[in-house]
């Protein structure tokens, strides 16, 4: 990378015409059709969607210890959502919270995980956004499992996030709070998107930055306020993450840049993937964004223009570059249960459920062994009917068992399967979702949901449930082989 190092000294301020691009209307990352309109959700809806904000559904960076926790959930229409739950004192004035949320909720872009709605009941303050199923940039960049992120994909992340910020700026949202690798999410097709949660502060009077002070813009440390230029600085730290594959303080990176020590700066995993000129150009852009004086940093439009010219392998889909399966595909060959579900082979599904038995209900066995004899007898009669393929009778006895207040995910999936065999797909779906509420990581419940959704003609939702079930089953198998 040494041959072009002299370029580094030239910075792209917002006055530099070489990086300027004309305004482009109707860009691909503009308004997106098909995204639900911003709306209000009831607290009860969100409790059901998250199994009462169960720990298993926490997806935020610091888990349940974070002051504002993000959960994954599923609505009654089977759409997956992300829910940010603010701390009790974050937004005491509900009107102010609603006003801020509505402004962000007007944005609709393919480059963002769009805000779908809010909940403002009592002391609760919650935001609802599109769910992105393929983790965060931090996960893929700092904690990768099989292979590091490729150079072409890193450039794509940089471009897409810059386009997201440009879209926000063009629509009156010039400030983004605490931009970092955890704010970059990957959708079903593994395309990077910017979380809309960062467009609202964590509280009415709260801090705009929660990360280590070494990564915050210098002017924020001086004044406690952020500007559009502060967002550019944070974008520079993101470029630095992409360049190094590590989360290193900007001051250290700038020292390496000044010393022309670029070999130490760049991620060794990227060796041979880019030219000296391309590597030097990204280093230059990073350095420009990290300038101490805010006025010396480039504007977002010039960064978009510069990053467009660096793009590689633009014809290759993101999920291919990432080495991840596209939504609706399996990372490994499907299991017999997944194959039966995918092929709508209900008879084989019954046989597999019989083999599984009640081993996944072991934690709950005390609930019936110490309960009234009537409940035990009802379950046993239901099991006998299920084995005899008398599904009408199985439904009757399993219903008796559940009506007595018993809790069993296995009984619910068996009744769900019985409903499927009796051409009662809606009832089957309801039971499968209840089973998942009891055991959120049990793949069987998702397979039953997939089968029921397919019968109901909801093929896209069926395929998503099937893929999620396959992933959970693979994780369970992997965990069992490691023990």
UniProtKB/Swiss-Prot annotation:
Binding-site residues, ATP: 62-70, 84
Occurrences of domain Protein kinase (ranges): 56-322
Any one GO cellular component localisation term in the record: extracellular region
Gene3D superfamilies: Phosphorylase Kinase, domain 1, Tetratricopeptide repeat domain, Transferase(Phosphotransferase) domain 1
Localization terms from the record: Cell membrane
Keywords: ATP-binding, Brassinosteroid signaling pathway, Cell membrane, Kinase, Lipoprotein, Membrane, Myristate, Nucleotide-binding, Serine/threonine-protein kinase, Transferase
Annotated membrane topology: Lipid-anchor
Enzyme active site: 178 (proton acceptor)
Lipid-bearing positions (N-myristoyl glycine): 2
Family: Belongs to the protein kinase superfamily. Ser/Thr protein kinase family.
Function (record text): Probable serine/threonine kinase that acts as a positive regulator of brassinosteroid (BR) signaling downstream of the receptor kinase BRI1. Functions redundantly with BSK3, BSK6, BSK7 and BSK8.
Protein name: Serine/threonine-protein kinase BSK4
Lineage: Eukaryota, Viridiplantae, Streptophyta, Embryophyta, Tracheophyta
């Amino acid at each position: 990378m040494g041959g072009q190092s002299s370029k580094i000294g030239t910075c792209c301020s917002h006055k530099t015409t070489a990086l300027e691009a004309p305004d482009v209307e109707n860009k691909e990352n503009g308004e997106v059709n098909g995204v639900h309109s911003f709306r209000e959700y009831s607290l009860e809806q969100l409790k059901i969607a998250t199994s009462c904000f169960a720990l298993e559904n926490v997806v935020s960076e610091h888990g349940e210890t974070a002051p504002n926790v993000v959960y994954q959930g599923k609505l009654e229409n089977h759409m997956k959502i992300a829910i940010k739950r603010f701390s009790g004192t974050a937004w005491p004035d509900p009107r102010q919270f609603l006003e801020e949320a509505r402004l962000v909720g007007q944005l609709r872009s393919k480059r963002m995980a769009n805000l779908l709605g809010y909940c403002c009941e009592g002391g609760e303050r919650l935001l609802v956004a599109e769910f992105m199923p393929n983790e965060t940039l931090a996960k893929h960049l700092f904690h990768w499992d099989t292979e590091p992120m490729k150079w072409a994909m890193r450039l794509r992340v940089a471009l897409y996030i810059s386009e997201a910020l440009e879209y926000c700026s063009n629509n009156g949202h010039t400030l983004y709070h605490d931009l970092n690798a955890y704010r970059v999410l990957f959708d079903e097709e593994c395309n990077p998107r910017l979380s809309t949660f960062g467009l609202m502060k964590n509280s009415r009077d709260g801090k705009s930055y929660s990360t280590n002070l070494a990564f915050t813009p210098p002017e924020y440390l001086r004044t406690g306020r952020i500007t559009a230029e502060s967002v550019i600085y944070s974008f520079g730290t993101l470029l630095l993450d992409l360049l190094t594959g590590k989360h290193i303080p900007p001051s250290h990176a700038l020292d390496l840049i000044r010393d022309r020590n670029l070999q130490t700066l760049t991620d060794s995993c990227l060796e041979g993937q880019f030219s000296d000129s391309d590597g030097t150009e990204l280093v230059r852009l990073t350095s420009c964004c990290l300038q101490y004086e805010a006025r010396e940093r480039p504007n977002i439009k010039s960064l978009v223009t510069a990053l467009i010219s660096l793009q590689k392998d633009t014809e290759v889909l993101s999920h291919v570059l990432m080495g991840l399966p596209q939504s609706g595909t399996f990372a490994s060959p499907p299991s017999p249960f997944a194959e039966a579900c995918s092929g709508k082979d209900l008879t084989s599904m019954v046989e597999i459920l019989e083999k599984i038995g009640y081993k996944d209900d072991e934690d709950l066995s005390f609930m019936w062994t110490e309960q009234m004899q009537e409940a035990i007898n009802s379950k046993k009669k239901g099991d006998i009917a299920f084995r005899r393929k008398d599904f009408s009778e199985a439904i009757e006895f399993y219903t008796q068992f559940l009506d007595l207040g018993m809790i069993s995910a296995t009984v619910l999936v068996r009744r769900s399967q019985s409903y499927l065999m009796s051409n009662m797909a809606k009832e089957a779906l309801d039971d499968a979702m209840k089973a998942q509420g009891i055991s959120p990581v049990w793949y069987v419940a998702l397979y039953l949901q997939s089968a029921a959704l397919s019968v109901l003609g909801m093929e896209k939702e069926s395929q998503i449930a099937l893929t999620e079930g396959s992933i959970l089953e693979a994780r369970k198998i992997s965990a069992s082989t490691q023990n």
